[in-house]
Swiss-Prot record:
GO CC entries: small ribosomal subunit
Domain S4 RNA-binding: 98-164
Signal peptide interval: none
Organism: Bdellovibrio bacteriovorus (strain ATCC 15356 / DSM 50701 / NCIMB 9529 / HD100)
Gene Ontology MF term list: rRNA binding; structural constituent of ribosome
Record protein name field: Small ribosomal subunit protein uS4A
Function, as annotated: One of the primary rRNA binding proteins, it binds directly to 16S rRNA where it nucleates assembly of the body of the 30S subunit. With S5 and S12 plays an important role in translational accuracy.
Gene Ontology process terms (BP): ribosomal small subunit biogenesis; translation
HAMAP family listed in its UniProt record: Ribosomal_uS4_B (MF_01306_B)
Protein family per UniProt: Belongs to the universal ribosomal protein uS4 family.
PROSITE patterns membership: RIBOSOMAL_S4, S4
Lineage: Bacteria, Pseudomonadati, Bdellovibrionota, Bdellovibrionia, Bdellovibrionales
Length: 208
């Protein structure tokens, strides 16, 4: 798990985009980014001109923070994406999207990716009928994710299911909240990825 040492609301403002790190709060008028949509700090509202390198760095940081992965993990995904038989940027996003913690969140069983990581680590989910407590596991087509029977009444999971109506489940996943399950119908395409990131700039950053 990536270590975050500053306010998660400041991260959204720094990257100039909602990263949805605080779950339900991000959809309300209490969202810090909605009230102050500019970078934190004394010169946050100043108009700065960024170099190409700085823009590439910001896109990389944005993606890392959106999915909550460490630099070491991110570099690993970039390396694997370079070896994939498709566009490197698309492969990178596919790896990030199919992480178990991201899938748990996207299916609507956690209020944020950070919360999803905690729930997975604490053995609240099954993958194809077996306990899965590694957030970075990559799911495949046909995999079934299930909330452990003993965890179905947890307040966090119940509140997440109630709040999921605010965001739709993408076509590559199928959620059955009545049965506390989710199925990977297919692997995601680029158009299935909601994060507003320029993946080509990330590839260029690591190609230096």
């Amino acid at each position: 798990m990536s270590c975050i040492n500053e306010s998660v609301c400041k991260l959204c403002r720094r990257e100039n985009v909602k990263l949805f790190l605080k779950g339900d709060r991000c959809y309300t008028d209490k969202c810090s980014f909605e009230r102050r949509p500019y970078p934190p700090g004394q010169h946050g509202q100043s108009r700065l001109k960024f170099s190409e390198f700085a823009l590439q760095l910001r896109e990389k940081q944005k993606a890392k923070r959106y999915y909550g992965v460490s630099e070491k993990q991110f570099v690993k995904y970039v390396g694997e994406a370079n070896r994939a038989k498709e566009l490197t940027g698309h492969a990178l996003l596919k790896f990030l999207e199919t992480r178990l913690d991201n899938v748990v969140y996207t299916l609507g069983y956690a209020n944020s990716r950070r919360e999803a990581r905690q729930l997975v680590k604490h053995n609240h989910f099954l993958l194809n009928g077996k306990r899965a407590n590694i957030p970075s596991i990559l799911v495949n087509k046909g995999d079934v994710i299930q909330v452990a029977e003993s965890s179905r009444e947890m307040a966090k999971i119940q509140s997440a299911i109630q709040a999921v109506a605010r965001r739709s489940v993408p076509a590559w996943l199928e959620a059955d909240h009545a049965k506390f399950t989710g199925t990977v119908k297919d692997l995601p395409n680029r158009e299935d990825v909601a994060v507003a990131v320029e993946e080509n700039m990330i590839v260029e950053y690591y190609s230096r």
